[in-house]
Amino acid sequence: MTDFNPESIASIGPKEFAQLVKATPDSKIAEVMAGDSRAKILDEVFNRMPTLFRADRAGATQAVIHWNITGGPGGSTDTYETVIENGACTVTSHPAREPKLAMTMDPVTFLKVVSGGGNPMMMFMTGKIKAKGDLGLAAQVAKLFDIPKA
C-alpha cells in the first residue's frame, strides 16, 4: 500500500482509498490532515462524491448538506457543500446555500465515514459527528453514496 499523502490518494480508486484509511493509524491521519496536504486531500475526497452518488437511492431527495471538517491548521474548519437535487450531486468548497443539514466532525472521523471504515450512526451517538438540521436526512446520507469497504 502507499503512503497517506495527496499524490497517492489522487492515484488510487475508492476501494484502495478505503484500504489506505483502514491501514493508516488515526494519529498519522490526524497529523497529515492538520498540515499543508489537508486541502488537497479534502478536495480529492469531495471531488469523488458525484461519481459515487446513487441517484437510484436518492429518489426525490432535494438537499443541501454542509460538511464542516474541524482540526485544520491553526484550529481552522473547512466547509464543503453537497447539493443533491434533480437526481444529481454537486460539490463545492465555497458554500453558498442554506443547508438542510450541517454535519461537523474531525478529519479522522470524516475519512472513516467516507471510506466505509466507521459506522456513522454510532459516531453520531457517541458525539464524534454533530448534526444540525434534518436528522432524518443525516441518517440517510451514507445510503445515498456507493461507499467502498476496505
Predicted regions and their residues:
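Feature captures hydrophobic
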Residues: M1-A150
